[in-house]
Amino acid sequence: MSNQEVELVIIGSGPAGYTAAVYAARAGLAPVVLAGSVTAGGALMTTTEVENFPGFVDGVQGPELMESMRAQAERFGASILLDDAVLVDLDGPVKTVETGSGETFHARAVILTMGSAYRKLGIADEERLTGRGVSWCATCDGFFFREQEIVVVGGGDSAMEEALFLTRFASKVTVVHRRGEFRASKIMAQRVLDHPKIEVVWNSEVAGLIGAEKVEAVSLRNTVTGAERKLPVTGVFVAIGHDPRSEIVTGLVDTDADGYVLVEHPSTRTNLAGVFAAGDLVDHTYRQAITAAGTGCAAAQDAQHYLAALDEAAPALTATEEVFA
Protein backbone atom coordinates (compact mmCIF):
# COMPACT_ATOMS: atom_id res chain seq x y z
CA MET A 1 0.00 0.00 0.00
CA SER A 2 1.24 3.47 -0.83
CA ASN A 3 0.22 7.05 -1.44
CA GLN A 4 1.46 8.61 -4.66
CA GLU A 5 1.21 12.18 -5.91
CA VAL A 6 0.86 12.34 -9.70
CA GLU A 7 -0.24 14.76 -12.37
CA LEU A 8 -2.86 12.63 -14.09
CA VAL A 9 -4.77 9.40 -13.46
CA ILE A 10 -6.66 7.71 -16.28
CA ILE A 11 -9.36 5.35 -15.01
CA GLY A 12 -10.03 2.69 -17.62
CA SER A 13 -8.32 1.57 -20.80
CA GLY A 14 -9.61 0.56 -24.23
CA PRO A 15 -9.10 2.82 -27.26
CA ALA A 16 -10.07 5.93 -25.28
CA GLY A 17 -7.91 5.26 -22.24
CA TYR A 18 -4.85 4.08 -24.12
CA THR A 19 -5.03 6.95 -26.63
CA ALA A 20 -5.35 9.43 -23.78
CA ALA A 21 -2.32 7.79 -22.20
CA VAL A 22 -0.27 8.12 -25.41
CA TYR A 23 -1.02 11.82 -25.75
CA ALA A 24 -0.64 12.59 -22.06
CA ALA A 25 2.65 10.73 -21.85
CA ARG A 26 4.02 12.52 -24.90
CA ALA A 27 3.06 15.80 -23.20
CA GLY A 28 5.24 14.84 -20.23
CA LEU A 29 2.40 14.21 -17.78
CA ALA A 30 3.53 10.67 -16.88
CA PRO A 31 -0.04 9.41 -16.56
CA VAL A 32 -1.01 6.49 -14.36
CA VAL A 33 -3.52 4.25 -16.14
CA LEU A 34 -5.76 2.03 -14.03
CA ALA A 35 -6.53 -0.35 -16.88
CA GLY A 36 -8.63 -2.75 -14.81
CA SER A 37 -7.82 -6.09 -13.20
CA VAL A 38 -10.20 -7.96 -15.51
CA THR A 39 -11.35 -5.47 -18.14
CA ALA A 40 -7.94 -4.17 -19.34
CA GLY A 41 -8.21 -3.31 -23.01
CA GLY A 42 -11.96 -2.92 -22.92
CA ALA A 43 -14.51 -4.56 -25.19
CA LEU A 44 -12.05 -4.96 -28.06
CA MET A 45 -10.28 -7.67 -26.08
CA THR A 46 -13.19 -9.95 -26.96
CA THR A 47 -13.53 -8.74 -30.55
CA THR A 48 -12.25 -10.83 -33.43
CA GLU A 49 -11.63 -8.98 -36.67
CA VAL A 50 -11.63 -5.18 -36.60
CA GLU A 51 -11.96 -4.15 -40.24
CA ASN A 52 -12.80 -0.46 -39.92
CA PHE A 53 -9.89 0.92 -37.88
CA PRO A 54 -7.83 3.12 -40.24
CA GLY A 55 -4.38 1.91 -41.20
CA PHE A 56 -5.07 -1.83 -41.21
CA VAL A 57 -5.79 -2.80 -44.81
CA ASP A 58 -6.47 -6.44 -43.97
CA GLY A 59 -8.07 -5.75 -40.59
CA VAL A 60 -6.63 -6.40 -37.15
CA GLN A 61 -7.59 -8.57 -34.20
CA GLY A 62 -9.09 -6.60 -31.31
CA PRO A 63 -6.62 -7.86 -28.68
CA GLU A 64 -3.70 -7.16 -31.03
CA LEU A 65 -4.86 -3.57 -31.54
CA MET A 66 -5.22 -3.02 -27.80
CA GLU A 67 -1.83 -4.54 -27.05
CA SER A 68 -0.22 -2.22 -29.60
CA MET A 69 -1.91 0.81 -28.04
CA ARG A 70 -0.84 -0.27 -24.56
CA ALA A 71 2.77 -0.77 -25.63
CA GLN A 72 2.79 2.59 -27.38
CA ALA A 73 1.55 4.36 -24.25
CA GLU A 74 4.19 2.64 -22.12
CA ARG A 75 6.88 3.53 -24.62
CA PHE A 76 6.20 7.22 -24.02
CA GLY A 77 6.20 6.89 -20.24
CA ALA A 78 2.68 5.96 -19.14
CA SER A 79 2.41 3.63 -16.13
CA ILE A 80 -0.26 1.04 -16.85
CA LEU A 81 -1.54 -0.92 -13.87
CA LEU A 82 -3.85 -3.94 -14.03
CA ASP A 83 -5.87 -2.58 -11.15
CA ASP A 84 -9.35 -1.16 -10.57
CA ALA A 85 -10.40 2.17 -9.14
CA VAL A 86 -12.73 1.34 -6.26
CA LEU A 87 -13.19 4.72 -4.56
CA VAL A 88 -12.76 8.25 -5.89
CA ASP A 89 -12.99 11.79 -4.53
CA LEU A 90 -13.07 14.18 -7.47
CA ASP A 91 -13.83 17.47 -5.72
CA GLY A 92 -11.23 20.16 -5.15
CA PRO A 93 -7.84 20.76 -6.79
CA VAL A 94 -6.50 17.35 -5.76
CA LYS A 95 -8.41 14.23 -6.78
CA THR A 96 -8.03 11.00 -4.82
CA VAL A 97 -8.29 7.58 -6.43
CA GLU A 98 -8.07 4.38 -4.39
CA THR A 99 -7.48 1.03 -6.08
CA GLY A 100 -8.49 -2.52 -5.37
CA SER A 101 -4.93 -3.42 -4.41
CA GLY A 102 -4.78 -0.70 -1.77
CA GLU A 103 -2.87 1.96 -3.70
CA THR A 104 -3.93 5.60 -3.33
CA PHE A 105 -3.20 8.20 -5.98
CA HIS A 106 -3.53 11.95 -5.50
CA ALA A 107 -3.79 13.65 -8.88
CA ARG A 108 -4.38 17.13 -10.22
CA ALA A 109 -6.48 15.77 -13.08
CA VAL A 110 -8.46 12.62 -13.86
CA ILE A 111 -9.69 11.21 -17.16
CA LEU A 112 -12.60 8.77 -17.01
CA THR A 113 -12.56 6.06 -19.70
CA MET A 114 -14.29 3.12 -18.01
CA GLY A 115 -16.26 2.26 -21.14
CA SER A 116 -19.37 0.13 -21.00
CA ALA A 117 -20.47 -3.36 -20.01
CA TYR A 118 -22.51 -5.96 -21.84
CA ARG A 119 -26.25 -5.50 -21.38
CA LYS A 120 -28.13 -8.50 -20.01
CA LEU A 121 -31.44 -9.93 -21.13
CA GLY A 122 -32.98 -9.46 -17.70
CA ILE A 123 -34.87 -12.74 -17.69
CA ALA A 124 -35.20 -15.56 -15.18
CA ASP A 125 -32.28 -18.00 -14.87
CA GLU A 126 -29.92 -15.76 -16.84
CA GLU A 127 -27.45 -15.52 -13.97
CA ARG A 128 -27.82 -19.18 -13.03
CA LEU A 129 -27.05 -20.36 -16.56
CA THR A 130 -24.24 -17.91 -17.24
CA GLY A 131 -21.25 -20.05 -18.13
CA ARG A 132 -23.59 -22.98 -18.65
CA GLY A 133 -24.75 -21.99 -22.10
CA VAL A 134 -25.32 -18.27 -21.68
CA SER A 135 -22.43 -16.09 -22.83
CA TRP A 136 -21.56 -12.56 -23.93
CA CYS A 137 -18.32 -13.48 -25.68
CA ALA A 138 -18.17 -15.61 -28.82
CA THR A 139 -14.39 -15.48 -29.01
CA CYS A 140 -14.15 -16.68 -25.41
CA ASP A 141 -16.72 -19.47 -25.52
CA GLY A 142 -17.48 -20.34 -29.13
CA PHE A 143 -15.13 -23.32 -29.17
CA PHE A 144 -17.24 -25.10 -26.57
CA PHE A 145 -20.23 -25.24 -28.92
CA ARG A 146 -18.67 -27.21 -31.75
CA GLU A 147 -21.33 -28.93 -33.88
CA GLN A 148 -24.14 -27.61 -31.69
CA GLU A 149 -27.11 -25.35 -32.43
CA ILE A 150 -26.97 -21.95 -30.77
CA VAL A 151 -28.75 -18.59 -30.64
CA VAL A 152 -27.35 -15.10 -31.01
CA VAL A 153 -29.58 -12.34 -29.64
CA GLY A 154 -29.31 -8.87 -31.18
CA GLY A 155 -29.46 -6.88 -34.38
CA GLY A 156 -26.43 -4.60 -34.41
CA ASP A 157 -22.92 -5.02 -35.77
CA SER A 158 -21.79 -6.80 -32.61
CA ALA A 159 -24.50 -9.43 -33.02
CA MET A 160 -23.60 -9.88 -36.69
CA GLU A 161 -19.94 -10.33 -35.81
CA GLU A 162 -20.76 -12.84 -33.09
CA ALA A 163 -23.01 -14.85 -35.38
CA LEU A 164 -20.48 -14.99 -38.20
CA PHE A 165 -17.66 -15.99 -35.87
CA LEU A 166 -19.75 -18.73 -34.28
CA THR A 167 -20.37 -20.39 -37.65
CA ARG A 168 -16.79 -21.65 -37.34
CA PHE A 169 -17.94 -23.95 -34.56
CA ALA A 170 -21.72 -24.35 -34.42
CA SER A 171 -23.72 -26.54 -36.76
CA LYS A 172 -26.39 -23.84 -36.91
CA VAL A 173 -26.68 -20.28 -35.65
CA THR A 174 -30.09 -18.67 -35.16
CA VAL A 175 -30.08 -14.88 -34.89
CA VAL A 176 -33.04 -13.60 -32.87
CA HIS A 177 -33.93 -9.94 -33.37
CA ARG A 178 -36.88 -8.12 -31.86
CA ARG A 179 -37.47 -5.99 -34.96
CA GLY A 180 -38.15 -6.69 -38.61
CA GLU A 181 -34.78 -5.44 -39.84
CA PHE A 182 -31.24 -5.23 -38.51
CA ARG A 183 -29.66 -2.09 -37.10
CA ALA A 184 -26.28 -3.35 -38.29
CA SER A 185 -24.32 -1.89 -41.18
CA LYS A 186 -25.47 -3.15 -44.57
CA ILE A 187 -22.29 -5.09 -45.24
CA MET A 188 -22.43 -6.97 -41.93
CA ALA A 189 -26.16 -7.64 -42.20
CA GLN A 190 -25.78 -9.00 -45.72
CA ARG A 191 -23.01 -11.36 -44.67
CA VAL A 192 -25.33 -12.82 -42.05
CA LEU A 193 -28.29 -13.08 -44.42
CA ASP A 194 -26.15 -14.81 -47.05
CA HIS A 195 -24.52 -17.32 -44.72
CA PRO A 196 -25.81 -20.90 -45.18
CA LYS A 197 -25.38 -21.79 -41.49
CA ILE A 198 -27.34 -18.80 -40.18
CA GLU A 199 -31.11 -18.47 -39.84
CA VAL A 200 -32.77 -15.23 -38.76
CA VAL A 201 -35.89 -15.08 -36.60
CA TRP A 202 -37.42 -11.62 -36.96
CA ASN A 203 -39.73 -9.77 -34.55
CA SER A 204 -38.85 -12.07 -31.69
CA GLU A 205 -37.17 -12.01 -28.30
CA VAL A 206 -35.85 -14.59 -25.87
CA ALA A 207 -38.53 -14.75 -23.18
CA GLY A 208 -37.08 -17.60 -21.16
CA LEU A 209 -34.20 -20.03 -20.73
CA ILE A 210 -34.89 -23.74 -20.37
CA GLY A 211 -32.51 -26.14 -18.66
CA ALA A 212 -31.69 -27.51 -15.24
CA GLU A 213 -27.89 -27.73 -15.25
CA LYS A 214 -27.24 -26.08 -18.62
CA VAL A 215 -29.14 -24.45 -21.48
CA GLU A 216 -31.29 -26.96 -23.34
CA ALA A 217 -33.68 -24.60 -25.14
CA VAL A 218 -35.03 -21.06 -25.24
CA SER A 219 -38.56 -19.76 -25.26
CA LEU A 220 -39.06 -17.29 -28.11
CA ARG A 221 -41.83 -14.69 -27.99
CA ASN A 222 -43.07 -12.95 -31.12
CA THR A 223 -43.01 -9.21 -30.44
CA VAL A 224 -45.96 -8.63 -32.79
CA THR A 225 -48.37 -11.46 -31.95
CA GLY A 226 -47.16 -12.42 -28.48
CA ALA A 227 -47.06 -16.09 -29.48
CA GLU A 228 -44.36 -18.20 -27.85
CA ARG A 229 -42.50 -21.26 -29.05
CA LYS A 230 -39.66 -23.44 -27.85
CA LEU A 231 -36.37 -23.60 -29.75
CA PRO A 232 -33.92 -26.36 -28.73
CA VAL A 233 -30.38 -24.92 -28.46
CA THR A 234 -27.39 -25.42 -26.19
CA GLY A 235 -25.95 -21.92 -26.31
CA VAL A 236 -27.25 -18.35 -26.07
CA PHE A 237 -24.91 -15.52 -27.02
CA VAL A 238 -26.22 -12.11 -25.99
CA ALA A 239 -25.27 -9.04 -28.06
CA ILE A 240 -27.95 -6.44 -27.30
CA GLY A 241 -25.83 -3.45 -26.45
CA HIS A 242 -24.00 -2.04 -23.49
CA ASP A 243 -24.49 0.02 -20.34
CA PRO A 244 -21.91 2.60 -19.17
CA ARG A 245 -19.54 1.59 -16.36
CA SER A 246 -20.21 4.79 -14.47
CA GLU A 247 -21.14 3.35 -11.08
CA ILE A 248 -18.00 4.61 -9.36
CA VAL A 249 -18.71 8.23 -10.32
CA THR A 250 -22.50 8.22 -10.05
CA GLY A 251 -23.51 11.17 -7.91
CA LEU A 252 -20.09 12.78 -8.35
CA VAL A 253 -20.18 13.86 -11.98
CA ASP A 254 -23.27 14.67 -14.00
CA THR A 255 -24.76 11.77 -15.96
CA ASP A 256 -27.81 11.34 -18.14
CA ALA A 257 -30.78 9.12 -17.32
CA ASP A 258 -28.96 6.06 -18.68
CA GLY A 259 -25.78 6.68 -16.70
CA TYR A 260 -23.62 8.10 -19.49
CA VAL A 261 -21.27 10.81 -18.25
CA LEU A 262 -22.15 14.27 -19.54
CA VAL A 263 -19.43 16.51 -20.95
CA GLU A 264 -19.33 20.10 -22.16
CA HIS A 265 -19.21 19.47 -25.90
CA PRO A 266 -17.11 19.93 -27.93
CA SER A 267 -14.68 19.49 -25.04
CA THR A 268 -14.40 16.46 -22.75
CA ARG A 269 -14.84 18.49 -19.56
CA THR A 270 -17.31 17.20 -16.99
CA ASN A 271 -19.05 19.42 -14.46
CA LEU A 272 -16.05 19.05 -12.13
CA ALA A 273 -12.88 21.05 -12.74
CA GLY A 274 -9.99 18.81 -13.68
CA VAL A 275 -12.18 15.80 -14.48
CA PHE A 276 -12.60 14.72 -18.09
CA ALA A 277 -14.40 11.81 -19.75
CA ALA A 278 -14.07 10.00 -23.07
CA GLY A 279 -15.02 6.92 -25.04
CA ASP A 280 -18.09 4.75 -24.61
CA LEU A 281 -18.59 6.10 -21.10
CA VAL A 282 -19.79 9.27 -22.85
CA ASP A 283 -20.81 8.18 -26.34
CA HIS A 284 -23.99 6.17 -26.85
CA THR A 285 -24.41 7.28 -30.46
CA TYR A 286 -21.38 6.19 -32.48
CA ARG A 287 -19.67 3.69 -30.16
CA GLN A 288 -16.74 2.93 -32.46
CA ALA A 289 -13.12 2.22 -31.61
CA ILE A 290 -11.98 5.14 -33.74
CA THR A 291 -14.40 7.62 -32.14
CA ALA A 292 -13.37 6.43 -28.68
CA ALA A 293 -9.72 6.94 -29.59
CA GLY A 294 -10.52 10.42 -30.89
CA THR A 295 -12.20 11.50 -27.67
CA GLY A 296 -9.33 9.97 -25.69
CA CYS A 297 -6.96 12.22 -27.62
CA ALA A 298 -9.22 15.20 -26.90
CA ALA A 299 -9.40 14.38 -23.19
CA ALA A 300 -5.63 14.22 -22.90
CA GLN A 301 -5.28 17.60 -24.57
CA ASP A 302 -8.03 19.09 -22.42
CA ALA A 303 -6.26 17.79 -19.31
CA GLN A 304 -2.93 19.13 -20.54
CA HIS A 305 -4.41 22.60 -21.13
CA TYR A 306 -6.12 22.52 -17.73
CA LEU A 307 -2.88 21.67 -15.95
CA ALA A 308 -0.94 24.28 -17.92
CA ALA A 309 -3.46 26.92 -16.87
CA LEU A 310 -2.98 25.94 -13.23
CA ASP A 311 0.78 26.25 -13.62
CA GLU A 312 0.47 29.71 -15.18
CA ALA A 313 -1.71 30.81 -12.28
CA ALA A 314 0.91 29.73 -9.73
CA PRO A 315 4.32 30.48 -11.28
CA ALA A 316 6.13 30.80 -7.97
CA LEU A 317 5.83 27.10 -7.18
CA THR A 318 5.98 23.98 -9.27
CA ALA A 319 2.60 22.54 -10.09
CA THR A 320 2.96 19.62 -7.70
CA GLU A 321 4.24 21.82 -4.85
CA GLU A 322 1.33 24.20 -5.29
CA VAL A 323 -1.51 21.72 -5.05
CA PHE A 324 0.09 19.43 -2.50
CA ALA A 325 1.38 22.21 -0.22
Q: What is each of the regions a protein language model found here?
A:
Residues 5, 122, 127-144, 240-288, ...:
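FAD-site-proximal beta/loop scaffold in flavoenzymes
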Residues 5-7, 83, 146-148, 203, ...:
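Phosphate-coordination loops involved in phosphoryl transfer and adenosine-cofactor binding
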Residues 6-76, 148-149, 160-186, 256, ...:
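Beta1-alpha1 glycine-rich phosphate/pyrophosphate-binding loop at the start
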Residues 12, 113-114, 120-122, 153, ...:
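Short, well-ordered coil/turn residues at beta-beta hairpins
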Residues 14-15, 39, 116-118, 157-158, ...:
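Residue-level detector of alpha-helix initiation sites
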Residues 22, 160-162, 272, 278-325:
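A conserved FAD-binding loop/helix module that cradles the flavin
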Residues 70-99, 104-107, 167-265, 305-325:
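A Rossmann-like FAD-binding core segment of flavoenzymes
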Residues 80-146:
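Glycine/small-residue-rich loop that forms an oxyanion/phosphate-binding "nest" at active or ligand-binding sites
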